[in-house]
């Protein structure tokens, strides 16, 4: 063949399909499985990190900073894998790798670092910022705000209605809408990945004949339907404000004020609530002064007990601390019953959670406190403390696991009868 004809054949020959060499993008089920696996290992790393921090900083620090420890564990997990350009354990489980939006290259270092900051660290600061804004915002005049002025134009009414919406509801709506879009398209599981153009692709060749055809479009449709129903309810409330439905306006204002996520009360409100509800806080020396200082601290949070609660073994903790402990340390689930067992933190003895003596113990200590503060009982206050501790010392002789200056559940009825 002459050289001229060979050149002509090369010129008219079709160009190779470079797209055939690209990796195939991952589908939604594979991405969800990888995310679930990563969430599990992040939890394991958080527990290990919490144990290490507990050795150096103490148990009280781990109980007062659980959110910070979770953020640190998530950032550490992604920094050791994604930031260094390696796969996470979840990505290794289903063989996924990060590629750019068009699938032609691997995401750069700055994109990976920005994704880790936006995914693991930024939500923590946003949450703290929203909480601070919520707590620092001064309440407006309730009389003028409960009823929307009918003389205002529609634009100002809409602006007032939107101003009553909380940050948490807006963020939840955005997240639900984004996850619905992911279920339909299967492209970006997180908003941060969409912002930094980080998509998942399979690291191996996919056999489409063996790949199941099912996907998550149905879940996306259900989420969209839920958002539509919520939007209709909000639109109905907006129309009701224009038509003068004051009852609906007041209910909306009450619902907006009851923001569970960001409505953290101030210290003054907490103290006022404690006085109204009669909560026992042993940090106050004036409450139950006959209890020794060495016995006023909780063994879980290492701070003064709030609403002391006695287990069957007699050891006492804060009500919230022992409930959180029981939720994390459930041992044997009762079959056919709504109860479960747990072990005491101090003596590791088994007890039934429904038998925690918070109410009875609270009533007993309140009753004894009133008797100790009465005029006829002040003269024998020291004698009462001695008798109280002697009785409990006898009980401790019968039960070596009794903590000493607090009654066990077995003696609560006895003291109620005596006093």
UniProtKB/Swiss-Prot annotation:
Subunit record text: Component of the peroxisomal translocation complex, composed of at least PEX3, PEX2, PEX10 and PEX12. Interacts with PEX19.
Record protein name field: Peroxisome biogenesis factor 10
Cytoplasmic side of membrane: 58, 142-158, 236-419
Organism of origin: Komagataella pastoris
Class of this enzyme: transferase
Catalysed reactions listed for this entry: S-ubiquitinyl-[E2 ubiquitin-conjugating enzyme]-L-cysteine + [acceptor protein]-L-lysine = [E2 ubiquitin-conjugating enzyme]-L-cysteine + N(6)-ubiquitinyl-[acceptor protein]-L-lysine
Binding site for Zn(2+) 1: 298, 301, 318, 321
Record: residues binding Zn(2+) 2: 313, 315, 334, 347
UniProt GO MF annotations: transferase activity; zinc ion binding
